[in-house]
Amino acid sequence: MSMAECTREQRKRRGAGRADEHWRTLSPASCAADALTEHISPAYAHLIAQAQGADAQALKRQVCFAPQERVVHACECADPLGEDRYCVTPFLVHQYANRVLMLATGRCFSHCRYCFRRGFIAQRAGWIPNEEREKIITYLRATPSVKEILVSGGDPLTGSFAQVTSLFRALRSVAPDLIIRLCTRAVTFAPQAFTPELIAFLQEMKPVWIIPHINHPAELGSTQRAVLEACVGAGLPVQSQSVLLRGVNDSVETLCTLFHALTCLGVKPGYLFQLDLAPGTGDFRVPLSDTLALWRTLKERLSGLSLPTLAVDLPGGGGKFPLVALALQQDVTWHQEREAFSARGIDGAWYTYPF
């Protein structure tokens, strides 16, 4: 089935009114209302109880409902990443040439109040139906240019062991070198999901990358650290991603502590994201000028091992954009006539390099 045929089928199905297929077209107001219930996992509640002062508040702010969520700004929309234009099926997004995104479920262990798929998560759609999974497998087999698949949702690890293993075996049947990225918040929200059986299975399914979403050093309790160490010890590469959130982790000290701790655990800090323009998330958004200033300081304090890529998903489907390009503008001067550029060095002096 071609992408065009899949897209036409998706539009037809939307007309049938299946809730789990039309969330991207919801109004911003409906997404920002009280639709996304407050839901906190026992493991995360335990982390909150263990944390002190500002750390406890930072964790609570991520999962506890606040009235500010009802405020919708003009720039916000239900589908801030513009995924709708790239949908092959309602559960598969093919935005980049060599990789696709699969929504395996609409369920999460906890509800992040800044979620950019809050309309989808609010519907709490269950595990992807078998017929939808088979359409994805068919598409992957017909599209050999796809070398990676991001398995996301929701959180894929909310599925049963049988569901997860069946899905991963189906994906692995496509090609032995298809890279599977497991995008999950379970490391912090539900570390018990990483059983020895699951880790052994993921080893069997290599190449598999674990992509945990971790925002604050207080999310790295002893159990969470043990999970990451177990994954790394089993030979599973782990690359984290974090979202910059006002009142949670928008300080140099907090982020330096987090990224250094992850690196010590063998986890590569992958991305630090500027917040997406999802409805009702404005209170979490750090002004871009502050973000760039913060990252410049992080760059001075952290090595390449510990420093993540600063990025934003451009609204409307423009894809990931490295904000490093903006952060370093003031540190670079181009000399076209001299066929060279000058850059500010670590000592503050300017140095010239020829084209």
From Swiss-Prot:
Record's keyword terms, sorted: 4Fe-4S, Iron, Iron-sulfur, Isomerase, Metal-binding, Pyridoxal phosphate, S-adenosyl-L-methionine
Pfam families, A to Z: Fer4_12, Radical_SAM
EC number: 5.4.3.-
Required cofactor names: [4Fe-4S] cluster; pyridoxal 5'-phosphate
One term of GO molecular function: 4 iron, 4 sulfur cluster binding
Gene3D superfamilies linked to this entry: Aldolase class I
Chain residues that bind [4Fe-4S] cluster: C108, C112, C115
Cofactor binding: number and manner: Binds 1 [4Fe-4S] cluster. The cluster is coordinated with 3 cysteines and an exchangeable S-adenosyl-L-methionine.
Domain Radical SAM core: 93-308
Signal peptide: none
InterPro entries: Aldolase_TIM (IPR013785), Lys_aminomutase/Glu_NH3_mut (IPR003739), rSAM (IPR007197)
Positions of modified residues (N6-(pyridoxal phosphate)lysine): K320
Enzyme class: isomerase
PROSITE patterns (alphabetical): RADICAL_SAM
UniProt record similarity statement: Belongs to the radical SAM superfamily. KamA family.
This protein's name: Putative L-lysine 2,3-aminomutase
